[in-house]
């Protein structure tokens, strides 16, 4: 298949002669050619029929945005032990001499080697709060990753059904072009017998050419959709895909209220915001802990040498939060404001999810009703009208415009039927991204 060809190659076009390996061929060459044949056949099978589940599986494995999010989750997870760890201890060493002119170690009581070790201990509870904040951030990223998974599945499903609809539209237009050809033949027959003007045949030809224009536009749309699907599954966007297999009709069995409740219970977006709130609450508590000082313990020895006794010391130092009005108090207010912001974001997320589910539920229900209308009433009636108009035109009892109008209406209703089918499938996929009931 070339880059510009969107239709899958028929099985008979594959160079199967290349798969015939002579007995005198070297062993390695035989193995190599055999593998090439297997890859060619498997690739052609993938190109002939496109399965939604295979696309979803490929996207979950290879989508670049998801791989980046997965690495981000790992990075945040590694922050947890860092946040709960003690600061590194400090080792200090040096030498103090009595004069600048000579080395007086062991000769003067003021000459000595100094060795000290110090360790800072945060005030009780600070390390636990820092670890709690880091853990909440990591869990929020995990929930965000799950939400991204669902969005990717939903987007793959949406583009898949758009591609399905584009191919269905091509089928309809291809079939109906034959009907315009029949009308053209009837118009030419009537024109040759003097029963109609040449304008009737020209009208049929013009409509047929307009359908060819739509075919070309659909082929361009198919290439665009294939590029989008390749992007989601992590493949080269120029690679062709096959035709979507027969789509399984999705159904909604819950009421609107049940779907909204399920989304609230299962939505990773909501869970991510809840984890962010937990982290913000820990930050508020942490900022309040900053009013209390940390303690630094220092142990050291002065080695004086000679007849002088060595000296040992143990000290403790604390930081004094004397500038609390410009440091600790604003920090507490900042953390409280961020907590309030996160709570508002949670409520906004719930409203957004509820609104989106309501919108897509209405779209799915409307599409279901319209499909029934097209399938049971408009398409059968339009088919009868077209057949009656064509028969009447052949008998000289109707004009060409009537036949063209009836046929265009039939094409429009058939395309609209499959458009509503595609829109319903996409709406249900979007709902599934919130509830977790994704059609895979």
In which residue ranges do the predicted regions lie?
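Small/polar-residue-enriched beta-strand and adjacent coil segments characteristic
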Residues: 89-147, 271-349
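N-terminal secretory signal peptides that target proteins for export/translocation
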Residues: 1-28
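Amphipathic alpha-helical coiled-coil segments
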Residues: 68-80, 148, 152-173, 182, ...
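Bacterial Sec-pathway N-terminal export signals of envelope proteins
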Residues: 46-95, 102, 120-121, 129, ...
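Short, charged, amphipathic alpha-helical segments
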Residues: 132-135, 198-206, 400-408
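Aromatic (phenylalanine/tyrosine) cluster motif
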Residues: 14, 32-34, 46
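Periplasmic alpha-helical coiled-coil/stalk elements that build and connect Gram-negative outer-membrane
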Residues: 30-31, 148-262, 266, 360-363, ...
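Bacterial N-terminal signal peptides
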Residues: 30-42
């Amino acid at each position: 298949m070339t880059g510009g060809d969107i239709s899958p190659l028929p099985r008979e076009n594959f160079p199967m002669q290349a798969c015939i390996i002579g007995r005198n061929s070297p062993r390695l060459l035989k193995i190599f050619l055999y593998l090439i044949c297997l890859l060619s056949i498997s690739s052609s099978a993938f190109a002939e029929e496109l399965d939604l589940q295979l696309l979803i599986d490929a996207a979950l494995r290879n989508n670049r945005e998801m791989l980046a999010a997965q690495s981000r989750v790992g990075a945040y997870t590694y922050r947890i032990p860092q946040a709960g760890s003690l600061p590194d201890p400090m080792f200090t060493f040096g030498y103090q001499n009595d004069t600048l002119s000579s080395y007086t170690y062991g000769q003067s009581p003021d000459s000595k080697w100094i060795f000290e070790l110090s360790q800072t201990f945060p005030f009780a509870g600070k390390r636990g709060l820092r670890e709690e904040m880091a853990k909440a951030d990591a869990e929020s990223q995990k929930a965000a990753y799950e939400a991204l998974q669902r969005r990717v599945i939903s987007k793959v499903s949406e583009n898949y059904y758009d591609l399905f609809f584009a191919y269905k539209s091509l089928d309809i237009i291809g079939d109906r072009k034959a009907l315009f050809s029949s009308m053209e033949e009837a118009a030419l027959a009537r024109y040759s017998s003097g029963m109609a003007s040449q304008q009737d045949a020209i009208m049929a030809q013009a409509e047929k050419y307009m359908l060819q224009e739509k075919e070309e536009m659909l082929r361009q749309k198919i290439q665009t959709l294939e590029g989008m699907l390749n992007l989601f599954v992590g493949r080269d966007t120029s690679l062709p895909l096959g035709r979507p297999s027969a789509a399984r009709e999705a159904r909604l069995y819950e009421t609107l209220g049940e779907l909204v409740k399920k989304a609230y219970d299962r939505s990773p977006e909501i869970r991510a915001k809840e984890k962010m709130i937990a982290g913000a609450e820990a930050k508020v508590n942490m900022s309040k802990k900053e009013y209390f000082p940390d303690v630094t313990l220092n142990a050291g020895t002065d080695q004086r040498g000679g007849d002088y006794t060595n000296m040992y010391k143990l000290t403790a130092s604390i930081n004094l939060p004397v500038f609390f009005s410009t440091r600790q108090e604003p920090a507490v207010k900042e953390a409280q404001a961020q907590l309030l912001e996160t709570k508002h974001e949670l409520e906004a997320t719930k409203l957004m999810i509820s609104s989106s589910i309501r919108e897509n539920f209405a779209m799915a229900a409307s599409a279901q009703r319209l499909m029934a209308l097209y399938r049971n009433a408009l398409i059968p009636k339009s088919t009868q009208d077209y057949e009656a108009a064509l028969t009447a035109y052949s008998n000289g009892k109707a004009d060409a415009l009537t036949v063209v109008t009836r046929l265009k209406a039939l094409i429009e209703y058939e395309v609209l039927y499959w458009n509503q089918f595609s829109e319903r499938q996409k709406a249900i996929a979007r709902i599934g991204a919130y509830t977790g009931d994704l059609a895979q």
